[in-house]
């Protein structure tokens, strides 16, 4: 089921996340770091290191917006959110066909967590 939720981030939150990501510098790492055995051979992108302060700042903004959004809450029924991950694609980068892993270890709780819901990055895409 696809549920489109427009404008999860208001203009100020979107501008804040974009500014943080634009200034992230060395926090951008090879996206294959979080890819499983199936995804690693076809994943050619960059993502923010989940341990970086910029990741935590962006995660807080996005997670707070999702937690306030009644459409997200009613569609996803989340008990616990995996901290959002931030990826980018420069010229020539791709992410080929693969299946994302359905379970990850939550970095703050150590609990196994289903990750079969994802957010399309349209809100952060440059327009």
Task: List where the protein language model places each region.
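Non-heme Fe(II)/2-oxoglutarate
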Residues: 1-85
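Catalytic core of non-heme Fe(II) oxygenases with the double-stranded beta-helix
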Residues: 70-127
């Amino acid at each position: 089921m696809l549920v489109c939720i427009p404008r999860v981030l208001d203009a100020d939150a979107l501008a804040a996340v974009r500014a943080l990501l634009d200034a992230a510098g060395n926090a951008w790492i090879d996206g294959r770091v979080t890819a499983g055995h199936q995804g690693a051979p076809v994943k050619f992108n960059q993502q923010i290191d989940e341990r970086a302060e910029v990741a935590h700042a962006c995660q807080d903004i996005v997670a707070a917006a999702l937690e306030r959004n009644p459409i997200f809450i009613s569609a996803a029924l989340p008990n616990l959110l995996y901290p959002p991950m931030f990826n980018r694609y420069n010229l020539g980068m791709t992410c080929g066909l693969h299946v994302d892993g359905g379970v990850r270890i939550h970095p703050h709780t150590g609990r196994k967590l289903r990750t079969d819901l994802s957010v399309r990055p349209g809100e952060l895409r440059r327009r």
